[in-house]
Every structure is written in structure tokens, then in C-alpha cells.
């Protein structure tokens, strides 16, 4: 797992950021910050009392994979925004669009199926 995070590993975050990132964007202490920000966003999206990070051990493997994908791309969103000038504008915007679309899909899934998702995860 990422040194400071629970829902995604450093490797997953770096993969989501992609090639061409600058040294600060792939620095471990920065990816630690971005995963914590992503986890905070996800906790807020689920609402109080769910405790994604606190109850991580009880979540099923399939949902852990889903959460890792969302968390790593949300963290990548912060990393890419840290210095979007690492890429040509079109590339940076494309990367941000992918991350943002995954986040919007996650929020939409929660809006429509939150109770079912929480129950299926065993929370």
C-alpha cells in the first residue's frame, strides 16, 4: 500500500499519473499527500459513519479493486494538477478529463446505489 494511504498503492497512483511526470509529481511524500486527499474525498462522498479506511480489512476483494482504481485516479488528479505543465496542454487536459470522469462516475454510482454498495462491501 502507499506509505500514508490505505486505498491505493504508490504504484497505482504513479500508473494513473502516467509517463512524463516531473520529479515532484512522482515523489513519494507527494503521492502520500495526494492519496490522503483522495481518501478524504471518498470518505466525504460516502458520508459519515461508513469508515472506508477504518474498515478496509472487511471490504471484499472486488470492492477493494474498485476503490483502488477510484482512489488512485483521484490522487492522480491532484498530482497532475500540481504541475500540468509537465505535458503538452492537450495531454494534461486529457489526463485530467479521464480522472475527473472516473470521479464523476463514482459519485453517480454512489448517488444511485449507495445503500447497496455499502451493504455489498460489508460496511
Question: What are these model-derived regions, one by one?
Answer:
Residues 1-64, 108-123:
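Conserved short "hinge" loops at termini or chain/domain junctions
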Residues 2-4, 73-123:
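Short loop/turn elements at secondary-structure junctions
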Residues 59-63, 67, 87-90:
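Short acidic, glycine/proline-enriched loop segments that cap or flank alpha-helices
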Residues 64-76:
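Core structural elements
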Amino acid at each position: 500500500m502507499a506509505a500514508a494511504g490505505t486505498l491505493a498503492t504508490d504504484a497505482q497512483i504513479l500508473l494513473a499519473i502516467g509517463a512524463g511526470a516531473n520529479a515532484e509529481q512522482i515523489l513519494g511524500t507527494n503521492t502520500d499527500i495526494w492519496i490522503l486527499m483522495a481518501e478524504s474525498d471518498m470518505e466525504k462522498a460516502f458520508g459519515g459513519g461508513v469508515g472506508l479506511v477504518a474498515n478496509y480489512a472487511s471490504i471484499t476483494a472486488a470492492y477493494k479493486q474498485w476503490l483502488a482504481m477510484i482512489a488512485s485516479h483521484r490522487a492522480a488528479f491532484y498530482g497532475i494538477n500540481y504541475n500540468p505543465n509537465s505535458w503538452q496542454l492537450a495531454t494534461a487536459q486529457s489526463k485530467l478529463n479521464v480522472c475527473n470522469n472516473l470521479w464523476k462516475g463514482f459519485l453517480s454510482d454512489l448517488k444511485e446505489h449507495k445503500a447497496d454498495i455499502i451493504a455489498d462491501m460489508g460496511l
